[in-house]
Amino acid sequence: MKKIIHIDMDCYFAAVEMRDFPELRGKPIAVGGRSDRRGVISTCNYEARKFGVRSAMASGYALKLCPDLILVPGRMSVYKEVSAQIREVFSHYTDLIEPLSLDEAYLDVTDCTQCQGSATLIAEAIRQEIFELTGLTASAGIAPIKFLAKIASDLNKPNGQYVITPNMIPAFVKDLPLIKIPGVGKVTGKKLEDIGLITCSDLQAYPEAALIERFGKFGSVLIERAQGIDTRNISPHRERKSVGVETTLAKDIYSLEQCQGVMPQLIQELATRIKRSAKDRTIHKQVVKLKFNDFKQTTIEHRSDEVSVKLFYDLLSQALERQQGRGIRLLGVSVGLASQSDIKTAEENEVRESQMDLGF
């Protein structure tokens, strides 16, 4: 049985700001863009959360909820530097580290002999070492499988940890809300709720074939998670799945021509990011994203094995068909990156087709 730890830093960006600027401590703060520039909250501290402020919320709305909220501009270079220090701490205990972002990661400590081999004690030691090195607190979840470790890390925040032992799994997942499963967002959660599926026990009793027919491959994943199954290993060299860029506009725009005026800069920035972080990867789709002034969003995608500027403009036109008179506050473009397993499967299929053509 594996021993998996999920480490999640507590309100990371905001915590770094409070560490570096002590005068911010005890006050509601948020890291994000200015409200007069249509900024969005990246993260906020617990004082701000008491007022209902949340990540991804418009800064202007956050200020309405909490008029005394202090907006702090992000310092990404500092956050990356501290993140590197945190990952160095992880390496003191295991080489099997799967970063999910700057402030969270999975660790497989199954073979770690420190702390008597106890994952619970290892998590405590990691959190203490992070605090001594950076002055920041972290929360941890400990479980035999990844998705439960991630859920557990959120159960005793801030600066705490929660353990799910193997014999606890059946009872734990029985009453677990499906919305808590990583990958089940608001949209999927609503679809599940519409067919009477709220908890994992509800899903356990649902016909498997019907679930797969409705949700495809993700239906199979849901069936496994509802039974407390997750066979994924820690991936130290986790493949990036996409590269994208988006911009929140200073004012709502409404016409195709206005949107087209924003596209060249976005596409140029996307090209730069692809060269920087995915130049050797294979592209398999292009995506255009719009967020409207009611904060609902839509995406349009199309298969593509190379970046086509024309395709981005075609997708933009299709996305605007869903506008329904609403103003557009955000526009984004991205590409999906094929995984190595996808490429291998495609190559194997090509070989099979060639063999069939040759009469093998």
From Swiss-Prot:
Its cofactor is Mg(2+). Keywords: Cytoplasm, DNA damage, DNA repair, DNA replication, DNA-binding, DNA-directed DNA polymerase, Magnesium, Metal-binding, Mutator protein, Nucleotidyltransferase, Transferase. Disulfide bonds: none annotated. GO terms for molecular function: damaged DNA binding; DNA-directed DNA polymerase activity; magnesium ion binding. Mg(2+) binds at D8, D103. Its EC number is 2.7.7.7. Pfam families: IMS, IMS_C, IMS_HHH_1. The keyword Iron does not apply. The record marks F13 as: Substrate discrimination. Residues 4-185 form the UmuC domain. The active site is at E104. Its main location: cytoplasm. One of its GO terms (cellular component) is cytosol. The keyword DNA-binding applies. InterPro entries: DNA/RNA_pol_sf, DNA_pol_Y-fam_lit_finger_sf, DNA_pol_Y-fam_little_finger, DNA_polymerase-Y, DNApol_IV, IMS_HHH_1, Rev_trsase/Diguanyl_cyclase, UmuC. Monomer. Poorly processive, error-prone DNA polymerase involved in untargeted mutagenesis. Copies undamaged DNA at stalled replication forks, which arise in vivo from mismatched or misaligned primer ends. These misaligned primers can be extended by PolIV. Exhibits no 3'-5' exonuclease (proofreading) activity. May be involved in translesional synthesis, in conjunction with the beta clamp from PolIII. PANTHER family: DNA POLYMERASE KAPPA, DNA REPAIR POLYMERASE UMUC / TRANSFERASE FAMILY MEMBER. This is DNA polymerase IV. It comes from Shewanella sediminis (strain HAW-EB3).
